[in-house]
Regions:
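Extended, charge-enriched helical/coil interaction regions that scaffold DNA-processing
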Residues: 1-201
């Protein structure tokens, strides 16, 4: 009763809404790279490339209102973009953890290249997907690094990982960080804010 609507909506974010959010994040990042940040009034949002909101076939109308092009009270375009990026991240995380058994800490330690496709040697078709990362509870001998483990995941979870790879890519490059997911401050103008690193801890 509780999980069903969460998973349904998470799949909708991955398959229907994710492309719009990625386009918005990339537009923001491109604008950030060519703009001068002014501490008092922030960025000039009028020159941010416009991105569209797609119609959702399941809803029969656009899945959300148009993106802000200028601040509305205390609600800024940057804050709005960050919130939608976090919604996408939460949806992908729900799918990946529910369908694979990966723990939250293990998810935060995944790297960008964690996803691998296992192909049929004769046809070349993908027969299964797996994620490679570090376990959170496996005992490690003192002085030795933990050995990576594999989680076999279904295609839906693989699509979630691929969306996370795309959604955070521009920020990985900017912060020189290869983790699959960064924290919310990564979308800001600095790599650190209030002492929080870009990588989830």
């Amino acid at each position: 009763e509780v999980l069903h609507p969460i998973i349904v909506h998470a799949l909708r974010y991955v398959d229907r809404y994710g492309d719009d959010v990625v386009a918005r994040v990339e537009a923001f990042e491109a604008h950030l790279a060519t703009s001068v940040y002014r501490p008092r009034d922030g960025l000039d949002w009028s020159t941010v490339p416009k991105t569209l909101i797609s119609n959702c076939p399941d809803l029969g109308h656009p899945w959300r209102e148009p993106w802000l092009i200028e601040p509305a009270g205390t609600y800024s375009p940057r804050y709005e973009t960050t919130q939608e990026l976090l919604h996408v991240t939460a949806a992908c995380a729900c799918l990946l953890m529910y369908l694979s058994g990966i723990r939250p800490l293990e998810l935060t330690m995944l790297r960008r290249d964690c996803l691998q496709a296992v192909k049929d040697p004769k046809t070349g078709d993908v027969i299964r997907w797996k994620v490679i990362g570090l376990p959170a509870k496996k005992r490690v001998q003192k002085g030795k690094k933990p050995k990576p483990v594999e989680w076999v995941i279904p295609e839906e979870a693989a699509r979630a990982v691929m969306l996370l790879q795309r959604a955070w890519e521009s920020m990985r490059r900017r912060h020189d960080d290869d983790h699959l997911v960064l924290n919310a401050h990564a979308l800001g103008t600095k790599s650190r804010k209030h002492g929080f690193p870009t990588t989830p801890q």
